[in-house]
Amino acid sequence: MSVPLRFSTPSSSPSASDNESVHDDGPTTELDTFNTTDVPRRVNTTKARQMRPKNTLKVAFSSPNLKGLDNTADSDSQPWLGGYLAGRLEDISGQSRRNYVDPYYEELNAGRRPNKPVWSLNGPLPHVLGNSVVEKISQKNQEARSRANSRVNSRANSRANSSVSLAGMDGSPNWKRKMKSAVFGSRVKLNDEEAQLPRNKSSVSIAEQAASRPKVSFSLQSSRQPSIAEEQPQTQRKSSAITVEHAENAEPETPRNNVSFSRKPSIAEQDSSQDITMPPNEIIAEESLDSGSDTETLYLNYWCKIRHFFREGFAEFLGTLVLVVFGVGSNLQATVTNGAGGSFESLSFAWGFGCMLGVYIAGGISGGHVNPAVTISLAIFRKFPWYKVPIYIFFQIWGAFFGGALAYGYHWSSITEFEGGKDIRTPATGGCLYTNPKPYVTWRNAFFDEFIGTAVLVGCLFAILDDTNSPPTQGMTAFIVGLLIAAIGMALGYQTSFTLNPARDLGPRMFAWWIGYGPHSFHLYHWWWTWGAWGGTIGGGIAGGLIYDLVIFTGPESPLNYPDNGFIDKKVHQITAKFEKEEEVENLEKTDSPIENN
């Protein structure tokens, strides 16, 4: 393993000034060095040496196999480029280290997901508006903009006509240039280096300020980041535009061995380099068919294509399977050992940690709901797509089915010993797979036990996942969700075994009926699994989300906070008023631009 060492090393530049080294306590060495404060882009060697600032920390690796790794790319501007040092420089500079990615890995990975929201239990929930609200806002905004455009164009035409008439009276347009210079400030064409220097706020014209402000508009199309194939033509067009604009003041490029730059190279300098390695166009794969591209999606193999369309369902399946393996396994272990293998507190923590691991497994793909009550609550109050709800529930049930099967198979010998034979199966061990209220609990009490427990679960989840409240640190949400499950189990779970999750009950119950416990597992406690395990949990989840949104949440994605027509009209009026001012300034500049060029 190579260890970074601090040395005072001479530069490899032929310039005399570059041979100066940074004095340090350590010895000198002839190993290749690299700069940790300003890593240039992947350009030619001469330009890379020119762009290094002097008197900076130099770091060398003791291993000779790491020589010649200086030409690493700027990972912030071109993340698809890379090298060995792309992941190590951030460690040396004291910042968090990003994972290394091979230059061609991202392009070959056809499973890249587009920029879509993920309703994850391991991070803040996305803020998404309903289609009806977006269509209403877009329609009103389009109508207001059309009216504003007509008014602005009429004003611009009237000013243009008056300008032509005045220019005809006076053959010299100098007075117009002076008036515009007094109002908007003088315009001076700058070269590429001067244009990037900071300017005083007073020297920026009103038109430039208006152009720098972002335009506010509404669109029904989903936003996504452009691919490399789409970004390259824009870079070339931008580079050509800069070259034409500064052609008059451009100076010939000469070697600057004694000059160090503290800025990043401009677009023109980037394009002038011939050593930038671009991946071949043949292997560039579009993100997804859902991203709006007409190019067919490429897949590594046939299974990758199947997984691409069912990835969210598979994630819910696997996350729920892990949840049930830990939970049902702890139930069976405590039962067959007559309490020696676990207590009620250990069972609660087992279910909580199982839920935590399930969320970590599926959180970045499907959200890690692992619970139909949570999925339905998110669809009602957080705009989770309704067409995904049955898909999620289907995979959650079957994940619980196979999770119960794995736990049962693991404890099969102990269950047989506990029951007294391999053909004997009683509700004593069957109750470890599915839930049932205690015999003395009334049906009203049993129902409201599940109702209240799931309401607390969903209400606390909405609070934890609300980034406008006090969300946990990134990556810690799933751990807190696990603690929440354990706390509910220890405080509100004794009378009904804290179902809280319809899939967790139905999946193992189906397996119990299939393995030999018989249909009696469905008939227990007057078909408890229908009105208790499903009705009580789903109703409680909806109630918990309703209470949180009623008293705390203010986002417009909740049905309790839908914007009415009056709010939309006022908001659109504010936007169009700002739009009119910006368009008026831009049209005034366009009208007077030919006169300035004269």
From Swiss-Prot:
Cytoplasmic side: 1-313, 368-388, 466-473, 554-598
Domain of life: Eukaryota
MF terms (GO), sorted A to Z: glycerol channel activity; water channel activity
GO annotation terms (biological process): glycerol transmembrane transport; water transport
Region called Disordered, residue ranges: 1-54, 139-176, 194-279
GO cellular component: plasma membrane
Domain notes: Aquaporins contain two tandem repeats each containing three membrane-spanning domains and a pore-forming loop with the signature motif Asn-Pro-Ala (NPA).
Name of the molecule in the record: Uncharacterized membrane protein C977.17
Organism: Schizosaccharomyces pombe (strain 972 / ATCC 24843)
